[in-house]
């Protein structure tokens, strides 16, 4: 059975340059909130059984509209936090996929590392490694291995 892992890069956050508090607290912009709502509409039909996110505010906020629409809680893990190891994040995704379809929200560096790692195993993925905010990779998992994936561009704002 093929299980889908929706690996989402968080929506547009406030600019780092003007942010004086810890980066983990940096929230979405108004545009980011619109992107999060559009992502919720896009992913809602897939009805992931779980939503797992980086604990950074911008990632949790990206999944809030989807969590509300599906009436499920957002779980957080440091394994999806900015700067996390891509191999550890991929292991987490594969583990989570054993329970069915899952949505995971992370950061550009982690998403890049996961997708790059998948491609080094010989899986062909058509799409960018470095993805823009509010876009995603839908990875297809069978037997605990990624067997394919589809890039999903960010929804129009």
Write out the residue ranges for each language-model feature:
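Short, low-complexity, intrinsically disordered N-terminal peptides in bacterial proteins
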Residues: 1-4, 154-157
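Active-site-proximal alpha-helix that buttresses catalytic centers in soluble enzyme cores
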Residues: 2-87, 124, 131-134
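Residues at the C-termini of beta-strands that transition into short coil/loop
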Residues: 9, 78-80, 140, 150-155
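Residue-level signal for well-ordered alpha-helical positions
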Residues: 65, 117-118
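Short, hinge-like loop/turn segments at secondary-structure boundaries
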Residues: 69-70, 92-95, 121-122
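Internal catalytic or translocation cores that form aromatic/hydrophobic pockets or channels
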Residues: 85-102
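A glycine-rich beta-strand to alpha-helix segment
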Residues: 97-117
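Domain-level recognition of soluble alpha/beta enzyme cores
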Residues: 119-148, 154
């Amino acid at each position: 059975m093929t299980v889908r892992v929706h690996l989402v890069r968080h929506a547009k956050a406030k600019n780092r340059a003007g942010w004086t508090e810890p980066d983990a607290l940096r929230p979405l912009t108004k545009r980011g909130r619109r992107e999060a709502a559009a992502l919720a509409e896009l992913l809602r039909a897939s009805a992931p059984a779980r939503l797992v996110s980086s604990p950074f505010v911008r990632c949790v906020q990206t999944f809030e509209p989807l969590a509300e629409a599906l009436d499920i809680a957002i779980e957080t893990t440091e394994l999806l936090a900015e700067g996390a190891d891509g191999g550890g994040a991929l292991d987490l995704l594969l583990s989570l996929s054993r329970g069915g379809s899952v949505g995971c929200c992370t950061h550009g560096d982690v998403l890049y590392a996961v997708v790059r790692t998948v491609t080094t195993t010989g899986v062909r993925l058509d799409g960018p490694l470095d993805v823009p905010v509010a876009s995603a990779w839908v990875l297809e998992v069978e037997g605990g291995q990624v067997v394919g994936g589809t890039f999903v561009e960010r929804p129009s704002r």
